[in-house]
Amino acid sequence: MKTETPSVKIVAITADEAGQRIDNFLRTQLKGVPKSMIYRILRKGEVRVNKKRIKPEYKLEAGDEVRIPPVRVAEREEEAVSPHLQKVAALADVILYEDDHILVLNKPSGTAVHGGSGLSFGVIEGLRALRPEARFLELVHRLDRDTSGVLLVAKKRSALRSLHEQLREKGMQKDYLALVRGQWQSYVKSVQAPLLKNILQSGERIVRVSQEGKPSETRFKVEERYAFATLVRCSPVTGRTHQIRVHTQYAGHPIAFDDRYGDREFDRQLTEAGTGLNRLFLHAAALKFTHPGTGEVMRIEAPMDEGLKRCLQKLRNAR
């Protein structure tokens, strides 16, 4: 075990940091400190803004001076996210684009975007270890743990606000590639089916089509056909949890190796065909958005990993 005892910090709030709640700001300043401890020091008045006590919901203003007390964090050495860890180092190799406002990476399958829920490592924690000097690193959107591909991270609060606005106004276009069961009918260009999210006692999220759910739409285009499968391009119009996975299942064409909404018989066929596939075949292939700093329209593409490419080549050869 090691114990870290940082000294008192006084942080002047910049215009870019203004507008966020003090509890969220402290989470970026006190990396690795449990939320319960952050709320405790707020409740006790150990955190001061302009020498006054504040509540967790206080919104910071430019020019505010925040006093952050010393926080003792006992942690196991091996559990700390270290820049020397192999996974953290590997993140440097999958960065597709970076400037002062944003960072875009090709997230590997099997890596969560956030640590927690029993996971010791997440992309955002890894990036913070990789970029310890960065004052701000926040996810613009999410990808499921087993989905690979384009993931956008904001390096400024103003960039995060701009990109979130684009998401709300449907000004951001996401394209995914999915390998689905059977022959997708070319005339099925869109699936519109409301989705309802349920949280099981285990904490697991399950989504199903329900008239009580939120309106949801995904557009589809056939990219390539194989003997018993189809590669489709999926473009979600709305951004619901597990949307593409549930919409393909609803259309009768579940995604390969989807342990929640898939078809084991389809997975077995792929295994017997020698594809070597053992992960969800859902890849965020491209993201189109307006750059929050320059106003330039950008389209960033993420190549598929070798495992997905090999799988498709096997299916081509078997036609």
UniProtKB/Swiss-Prot annotation:
Which GO terms fall under biological process for this protein? Answer: enzyme-directed rRNA pseudouridine synthesis
InterPro entries with a match to the protein in the record: PsdUridine_synth_cat_dom_sf (IPR020103), PsdUridine_synth_RluA-like_CS (IPR006224), PsdUridine_synth_RluC/D (IPR006225), PsdUridine_synth_RsuA/RluA (IPR006145), RluA_PseudoU_synthase (IPR050188), S4_RNA-bd (IPR002942), S4_RNA-bd_sf (IPR036986)
Which organism does this sequence originate in?
Escherichia coli O6:H1 (strain CFT073 / ATCC 700928 / UPEC)
On whether Calcium is a keyword of this UniProt record, the answer is no
| Source organism superkingdom | Bacteria
Can you say what this protein is called? Ribosomal large subunit pseudouridine synthase C
NCBIfam families given for it?
PRK11025.1 (NF008249), rluA_subfam (TIGR00005)
- CDD domains, from UniProt? PseudoU_synth_RluA_like (cd02869), S4 (cd00165)
* Gene that this sequence comes from: rluC
Q: Which EC number(s) does the record attach to this protein? A: 5.4.99.24
